[in-house]
């Protein structure tokens, strides 16, 4: 397997070359074991927190450099926490009809799978660059593990996040909202994820809505899914800041992926 992509919160993995076992799609993501600790003797993951807003193009260039270095054995794995200025990104399956307001913010084409998503201030973006050869070479288990990190983080704030087999990401039930047209309970997305793998090194990652301007999601059909809404921790009534979430994110990450240490010279 050379490269695979997964969208920010929708669809199945697009495997560009074969490499998955016959049981790949048999288990639900809830049933998959999500322990992704590295092989014994592996160094801890670098944990980087950037202050201020990081331009999207700059972040992608940095990810590309880090992924190449990790794949070559020249750098340790990295988790990078940051915020972007307001923007939309288009995955490889993006339908231009889902870009409702094309002039609202800059739109970036990106190599990840999937459709459109929004990034902006108040949203914690987490770029996860791990060498799955040191862990488990299982794309679906990796996606489930990232979702598990989000769910554990939310649980530490007494928020129940849930998976849905037909839509990747993490969702919260909204019983106070009107029922869906099919009679089901309303649900909002609170966290999205979208990954790409190169030589079994992951990049891109996940995002958690802490306190973004939720109106900016109206400029797109997020991941092509119009039946459900979008929420944030503050929208749910939690008086939290991004720094508070960062502490819990690291705790949850270490429970699933193993030790992480602040990068020398990094903020946080």
From Swiss-Prot:
Broad class of the protein's primary localization: cytoplasm
Subcellular location, record wording: Cytoplasm
Reactions mediated catalytically: octanoyl-[ACP] + L-lysyl-[protein] = N(6)-octanoyl-L-lysyl-[protein] + holo-[ACP] + H(+)
UniProt keywords, alphabetically: Acyltransferase, Cytoplasm, Transferase
Domain of life: Bacteria
A Pfam family matched in the record: LplA-B_cat
One GO term describing the cellular component: cytoplasm
A GO molecular function held by the record: lipoyl(octanoyl) transferase activity
Residues that, per the record, bind substrate: 112-119, 192-194, 205-207
Family: Belongs to the LipB family.
Purpose of the protein: Catalyzes the transfer of endogenously produced octanoic acid from octanoyl-acyl-carrier-protein onto the lipoyl domains of lipoate-dependent enzymes. Lipoyl-ACP can also act as a substrate although octanoyl-ACP is likely to be the physiological substrate.
Additional remark text: In the reaction, the free carboxyl group of octanoic acid is attached via an amide linkage to the epsilon-amino group of a specific lysine residue of lipoyl domains of lipoate-dependent enzymes.
Name the record gives this protein: Octanoyltransferase
Organism expressing this protein natively: Agrobacterium fabrum (strain C58 / ATCC 33970) (Agrobacterium tumefaciens (strain C58))
Organism lineage string: Bacteria, Pseudomonadati, Pseudomonadota, Alphaproteobacteria, Hyphomicrobiales
């Amino acid at each position: 397997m050379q490269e695979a992509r997964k969208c920010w919160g929708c669809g199945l993995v697009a495997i560009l070359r074969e490499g998955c076992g016959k049981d790949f799609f048999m288990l639900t993501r809830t049933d998959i074991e999500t322990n992704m600790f590295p092989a014994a003797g592996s160094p801890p993951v670098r944990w980087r927190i950037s202050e201020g807003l990081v331009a999207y193009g700059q972040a992608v260039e940095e990810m590309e450099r880090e992924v190449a270095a990790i794949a070559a054995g020249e750098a340790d794995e990295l988790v990078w926490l940051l915020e972007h200025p307001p923007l939309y990104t288009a995955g490889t399956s993006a339908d231009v009809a889902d870009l409702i307001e094309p002039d609202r913010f800059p739109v970036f084409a990106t190599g990840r799978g999937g459709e459109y998503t929004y990034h902006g201030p108040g949203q914690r973006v987490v770029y996860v660059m791990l060498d799955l050869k040191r862990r488990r070479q299982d794309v679906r288990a990796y996606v489930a593990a990232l979702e598990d990190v989000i769910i554990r983080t939310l649980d530490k704030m007494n928020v129940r996040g849930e998976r849905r087999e037909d839509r990747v990401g993490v969702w919260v039930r909204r019983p106070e909202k009107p029922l869906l047209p099919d009679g089901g309970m309303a649900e909002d997305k609170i966290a999205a994820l979208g990954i790409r793998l190169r030589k079994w090194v992951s990049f891109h990652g996940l995002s958690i809505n802490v306190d973004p301007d939720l109106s900016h999601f109206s400029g797109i059909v997020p991941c092509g899914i119009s039946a459900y809404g979008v929420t944030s921790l503050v929208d749910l009534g939690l008086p939290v800041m991004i720094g508070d979430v960062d502490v819990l994110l690291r705790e949850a990450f270490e429970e699933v992926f193993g030790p992480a240490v602040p990068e020398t010279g990094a903020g946080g």
